[in-house]
Amino acid sequence: MISHKRIQVYEHSFLRIGERDFDTKHFIALSKLNALHNYQYFDLKHNGVVFKQFVGVLQVDNLTIEILPKIDRYEPEENKKKWQSVLIEMLHLTKKLKIHEAGQTNVARQSITLLDIYFEWFLSEVQLLIHQGLIKQYYKQTGNVKALKGKLEFAIHIQKNLAHKERFYTTHQVYGKDHLIHQVLGQALDIITNLSKGSYLHAKCKTLKLDFPEVKSINATESTFTKLPRSRKNAPYETAISIARLIILNYAPNISKGTEKMLALLFDMNKLWEEYILIRIKQASKDNNIQVYGQNSKTFWRNVSIHPDIVLLCDKEQFIIDTKWKNIGNNKPSIHDLRQMYVYNEYWKSSKSLLLYPSSNDDFDGYIRFVSLDNTADQHKCGLGKVSIFKDCNTLLNDQIGSKILNWIMNEDKIRV
């Protein structure tokens, strides 16, 4: 049985070659993957890898690397279980991940990786589709038939059937299950079968393939997914297709002629934090007269647009929230961030804006007015909020975080000069 190895690291940490089963072949594979993605995932050193703000999971052959988020600069090793749970819950809430009961149990036992959860999600969706009954579609098929139907491919017919007068080489329509949707799902099943060897999911995957129709092997690309038909008949397939897309487009077999099979499911933690806060604020504002918008944009210069992370609209008044996934400690916000908030206030006619950072403890000390060039008394202002992402137990995510942020924004101003 193939032995699977697992490494857990934090974002912005350094993983040295030779450390914790991370070998030169893994380093080379990661460097090639990084080049394919415009060097955005890692910084490469001569002796290892420095991870950036991307979190998630990588698998190179039998080595799985989980990249976990963190707030503090130096996060203890023993907190990795807590931060894995944070990442899973954030992905779940933002609908990038779904955990089934078996997966939930395994997560609690720390016997499962993030990649296993994605694989299990996909297999459960395909199993459900098989149980409901896989759809048939019309599709074109080219080959030899014994009765003339469809379009005769004359040149190939002469070439192949000169000695077989009873055959016809045609392109014709077939009504069956070997269509593009099932071919895409079949490719994802093959990838999971390959990468799950030695894990508890491998047997489940092999069993599922026995119930899945035999379909033509394809190598799906980004354009393949744009060709998939959409209809009410196909609606039950949407989740399975979206997971298949994530798996297929992030799978790199024999990357740049190497021998390692690799899959990378990585998420920008800045964007994930933004989406997470947006959802929590929407949840908190359901019973209030507050409209919440994400990535509302306005033209800034020529074709350049600006878009704050979150815009709140209440009684025709707008408020701005911009999220930053970084711990600034006791430091002031950067000049760049303050300029950004000033421009947002000006363009959205907002009286106040909030820079929002994650923290271990809540800290909000009101708003400070921007200095007015024309001595305007009611100049707009900006606040700095550090919000605890955990409940008091410091292990579970605070599901009331949205209410806390709304309270900072909507209550009477506490203004400092």
Describe the predicted segments one by one.
Residues 1-257, 263:
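Residue(s) in the substrate-gating loop at a strand-loop-helix junction
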Residues 1-31, 257-417:
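Catalytic core segments in nucleotide and nucleic-acid processing enzymes
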